[in-house]
């Protein structure tokens, strides 16, 4: 009996290592919005992060020998961000451990990673509709004319234009007409990393790369919110990275494996992003014609 328990314990450690490795890799490659925005680590012992925001200042012409006529007031507003725990639990039976099947452990890890990535990404996507500025409307087309206008307005109003994110079915409407025209352009250096590059549509309009995210949900009118923003418009606050916890359940003859993280998604600067409400109906009919 002692020998069996030792074997099971060793298999559990091996299983945990495989699952966590696969979960981390899968998560990193399945949350495009999280990879596009600023990541901030919360210092140990701190409950929340306070970010001061100072209003735009104006520089003035000076006259030699004369004092400044104008002075700028510093009246910062504060954006506060907090984190909360998010996790997932998997019950691993002794029988599964005895089989010692690495493929099964890898599949479990992938599913755990996909679940955590989906949770983080949808938390970040939920910020899109909260921006004060919004372009588009229900059933409006995500086409070249409309999105070119969005970019022009965003630049005119000093809204961030580091990236655009929308649902693949919205971007699909534009892709066939502009790929040949814009295919020679490349991504900015800041986004030249695998987890982000994988979600680039291949389109860049007026210097703004367009990314796809299938986690964006639609409303009853087949429309949904994307975003045009700078990296610092939204933030991903990390209070604690992945931690693994195990608890033995003898009646189940199994071990509960719990993965927990503590993080928060927050809007850092309302003036640096805008919501994009555009249509993305099912492409099934067009794809089969």
Predicted segments — roles?
Residues 1-76, 234, 287:
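N-terminal "assembly arms/tails" that initiate or stabilize quaternary assembly
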Residues 100-107, 223, 245, 249:
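Short alpha-helix boundary/capping segments
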Residues 145, 152-239:
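Extended oligomerization regions of viral-like shell subunits
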């Amino acid at each position: 009996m002692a020998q069996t328990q030792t074997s099971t314990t060793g298999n559990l450690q091996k299983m945990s290592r495989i699952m966590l490795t696969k979960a981390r890799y899968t998560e990193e490659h399945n949350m495009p919005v999280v990879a596009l925005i600023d990541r901030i680590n919360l210092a140990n012992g701190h409950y929340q992060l306070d970010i001061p925001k100072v209003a735009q200042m104006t520089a003035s012409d000076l006259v030699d020998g004369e004092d400044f006529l104008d002075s700028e007031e510093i009246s910062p507003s504060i954006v506060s961000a907090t984190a909360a725990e998010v996790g997932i639990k998997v019950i691993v039976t002794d029988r599964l451990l005895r089989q010692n099947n690495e493929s099964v452990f890898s599949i479990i890890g992938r599913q755990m990673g996909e679940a955590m990535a989906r949770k983080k990404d949808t938390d970040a996507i939920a910020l899109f509709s909260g921006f004060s500025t919004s372009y588009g409307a229900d059933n409006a087309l995500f086409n070249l004319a409309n999105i070119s206008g969005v970019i022009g307005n965003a630049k005119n109003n000093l809204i961030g234009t580091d990236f655009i994110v929308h649902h693949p079915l919205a971007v699909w409407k534009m892709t066939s007409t502009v790929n040949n025209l814009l295919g020679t352009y490349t991504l900015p250096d800041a986004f030249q990393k695998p987890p982000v590059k994988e979600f680039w549509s291949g389109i860049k309009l007026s210097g703004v790369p367009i990314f796809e995210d299938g986690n964006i949900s639609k409303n009853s009118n087949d429309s949904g919110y994307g975003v045009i923003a700078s990296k610092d418009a939204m933030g991903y606050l990390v209070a604690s990275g992945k931690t693994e916890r195990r608890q033995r359940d003898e009646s189940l003859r199994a071990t509960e494996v719990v993965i927990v993280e503590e993080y928060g998604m927050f809007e850092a600067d309302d003036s640096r992003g805008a919501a994009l409400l555009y249509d993305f109906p099912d492409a099934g009919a067009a794809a089969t014609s």
